[in-house]
């Protein structure tokens, strides 16, 4: 990778992390920085963006950023959005093709992370799209994780979306 490409990736990632929509647009449209340019840490702007900024996500995705990019631990932007509870960002990612059934390095789907953190609205959104029979590295399904946490509201949501496996 060329030093110029890394510097461009650093600038784009920095602007995305700060939530600076104008700078992200300038870099993408005027300087023609590729939306999946890697920064010096091997991450894209979508991976390091300020998750509360759906405008950043939209701009990057409209310019061709991959919604399914994973870091070395297997974490993708949908994992991060689910874990941190940013439903609006998660919806934007899914609308642009993010796969909610790709596990991270621990075998967890985004819904496992949302259950673990107690993000009810995120669990409700993901339940219809997720493989609820998928087990994480500890062998737990999202429902079993909710039961283990004693989170009855999440248990109710998940049970409402359960379909018997074939």
Swiss-Prot record:
Entry keyword set: Acetylation, ANK repeat, Cell cycle, Cytoplasm, Nucleus, Repeat, Tumor suppressor
Start and stop residues of the ANK repeats: 41-69, 73-102, 106-135, 138-166
GO molecular function: cyclin-dependent protein serine/threonine kinase inhibitor activity; protein kinase binding
Cellular component GO terms held in the UniProt record: cyclin D2-CDK4 complex; cytoplasm; cytosol; nucleoplasm; nucleus
A GO BP annotation: response to UV
Record-linked Gene3D superfamilies: Ankyrin repeat-containing domain
Domain of life: Eukaryota
Main location: nucleus
Cell cycle recorded as keyword: yes
Location in or out of the cell: Nucleus; Cytoplasm
InterPro entries: Ank_Repeat/CDKN_Inhibitor, Ankyrin_rpt, Ankyrin_rpt-contain_sf
Pfam families in UniProt: Ank, Ank_2
N-acetylmethionine: residues bearing it: 1
Self-association state and partner proteins as the record states: Interacts with CDK6.
Family recorded in the similarity comment: Belongs to the CDKN2 cyclin-dependent kinase inhibitor family.
PANTHER family the UniProt entry points to: ANK_REP_REGION DOMAIN-CONTAINING PROTEIN, CYCLIN-DEPENDENT KINASE 4 INHIBITOR D
Function: Interacts strongly with CDK4 and CDK6 and inhibits them.
This protein's name: Cyclin-dependent kinase 4 inhibitor D
Organism of provenance: Homo sapiens (Human)
Gene that this polypeptide is encoded by: CDKN2D
